[in-house]
Amino acid sequence: MKIGITGAEGTIGSVLRKGLSNKYKISSFTLKNQDFESIQMDLSNNNEIQGKFEGLDALIHLAADPRPEASWESVKKNNIEATFNVYNEVKKAGVKKIIFASTNHTQHGDTLLTTPETLDLQKSKILSLENNTNPDSLYAVSKLFGEDLGKYFSEQYKIKFIGLRIGWIVKEDDPTVMCGTPSEDYLRSMYLSHRDCIQVFERALESSRNYLIAYAISNNSRKVFDLKETSRALNFNPEDNSENYFMNMK
């Protein structure tokens, strides 16, 4: 299978380029020149992406402004206009599947403490995919747009679509990097390890579902997302738990 990865220079992109390379032929798409082979283009510029996805079987769309505090101007350009351009080019190129990097922030609006990367433990509760969305930022709003646009392209153009509401993956692959900070509780809940990240994207690539929204977090003791439906739909069985890292600190 030939797959493309937009935003291949980011943390998740770097994990997937390495973790999926033994099984898939990967084309990397980046905004700027990198120290690895990639095709440079601005996804918000429709002219730059024309023809770039030809020959792909699936596209993993990671590229975005990932900051919860991102301005509307940036969100509109990098997360909304770019995502439409990507999906539209996927359609033109005959790509059969989109894996979209959505976010946990789509359901975090009433449980943040002070900022989108904090968690109010008094309001924390187990949420499922059946619960209403509650975006905590314009960034999260843009990801809901990506999910809904994916539904449109799935229904109207028969492109398979899986949106992964991703937790928090850190470059160090160790949630204790936030120990003692205001974001510690949030990361303990939302942690996604590198190997669990690779597994959930691989399961998404292998899935035959026409349209699916799923969670992408590790099996954390403090998780706030119910993984049962995701595990059933994708055969995703995360191996890691953020609490194990903190226990090893003692």
For the regions a protein language model found, what residue spans apply to each?
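N-terminal Rossmann NAD(P)H-binding glycine-rich loop of SDR-like oxidoreductase domains
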Residues: 3-21
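Rossmann-fold cofactor-recognition segment
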Residues: 31-45
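Active-site helix of classical SDR
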Residues: 138-145
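Conserved beta-loop-beta element that borders a ligand/cofactor-binding pocket
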Residues: 147-171
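Substrate-positioning beta->alpha
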Residues: 141, 162-166, 180-203
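Conserved C-terminal active-site "lid" loop/helix of NAD(P)H-dependent oxidoreductases
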Residues: 178-179, 213-237
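NAD(P)H-binding glycine-rich loop region in Rossmannoid oxidoreductase-like domains
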Residues: 41-78
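Conserved Rossmann-fold NAD(P)-dependent oxidoreductase catalytic core, especially the SDR/UDP-sugar
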Residues: 87-136
